[in-house]
Regions:
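N-terminal hydrophobic/helix-forming segments and targeting peptides
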Residues: 1-146
Length: 146
């Protein structure tokens, strides 16, 4: 495989939303790619993807297909979302990052993970605020009502 093909494959895989518990799309993508390569992927009862060419493989490669996530705990009156972490990621690592919110019906919304009162030009204490579930929220890029 050429380097450019590997980069394109990784870009396609990275674009798939796969928070913990929602990895079916990423698994299906990988299974399809393995089939195209002439391999025979098998899905386990737990949803893991196994690809074996020999009864006793000489090399084993394991990888996570789920991404770090959060779970909505509350919809605020102004339409922002309060969330709790899924996994042990530090809040400040993702502050200001775009996120995708997966609704219970499968609908997706884009938004941004922000500290409360994120405007540095009016909030002189923004650098001192501890980042936590109590001080962070998701602002959706959509018109919302609660």
């Amino acid at each position: 495989m050429k380097n450019s093909e590997i980069v394109e494959l990784l870009r396609e895989l990275e674009a798939i939303n796969s928070p913990s518990g929602y990895t079916k799309e990423a698994i299906a993508f990988l299974a399809d790619r393995f089939r195209r390569a002439g391999l025979n992927p098998k899905l386990t009862n737990k949803g893991a993807l196994l690809v074996c060419e020999h009864p006793e493989p000489l090399t084993v490669c394991a990888a996570h297909v789920d991404t770090l996530g959060a779970m909505v705990t509350r919809l605020e009156g102004d339409g922002t979302l309060r969330v709790t972490q899924v996994g042990g990621w530090p809040w400040n690592s993702f502050e200001g990052e775009y996120v995708t919110v997966l609704g219970s019906t499968g609908k997706k919304w884009r938004g941004t993970l922000l500290c409360d009162n994120p405007a540095a030009h009016v909030n002189r204490d923004i650098g001192k605020v501890e980042r936590s579930a109590a001080t962070m929220h998701i602002r959706l890029d959509a018109e919302v009502k609660s």
